[in-house]
Amino acid sequence: MNTLIDNPKAMASGYLAMAQMFSYPDADAWRRLTENGLVDPALGRETLEAEYLGLFEMGGGTSTMSLYEGQNRPERGRDGILQELLRFYEFFDVHLNQDEREYPDHLVTELEFLAWLCLQEHAALRDGRDAEPFQNAARDFLVRHLAAWLPDFRQRLEATETTYAQYGPTLGELVETHRSRLGDQPQKSREMQ
């Protein structure tokens, strides 16, 4: 287990960093990525933007790689996934930013929600409150959502010849470390799917 991310606050930072990496690299995002050391400035924003568009957005709904859980898990049906995700978010009174037209099943939205759960867990532990509801929610969310579609997504991502290919192992390690920290057995949850 990676001891650098073996606490909820560090986990939240890891999820937020991953969310930045998989966000559209506009000028503001590029600034944050380079300032935080997440991307080598020598790569160039235009190069990263072209890779992002070519990998995730070209061809509309038939892009090479989809950042949407519902499109990565067609056997579950996107409508059902969206409804379940919205219930998750609503249970914790988390609202999507309507101005940015966020989708509940977008990878960045799921990463940001996991970061939020980790921060709530951290605050509960810091304040001497019960953190178990947030730990249980994170475990359940990982099993039902992100960890259910990440392995296939990651395999396809790592097969690309893009900058984004290098993010797959980091994201996979973060999720597996979090699951291990929560006491979830990765193989067991895969068998439940």
Curated annotation (Swiss-Prot):
The keyword Cytoplasm applies. It holds the Pfam family Nitrate_red_del. The keyword Lyase does not apply. InterPro entries: DMSO/NO3_reduct_chaperone, DMSO_Rdtase_II_chaperone, TorD-like_sf, TorD/DmsD_chaperones. One of its GO terms (cellular component) is cytoplasm. Belongs to the type II DMSO reductase enzyme chaperone family. This is Chlorate reductase assembly chaperone protein. It comes from Ideonella dechloratans.
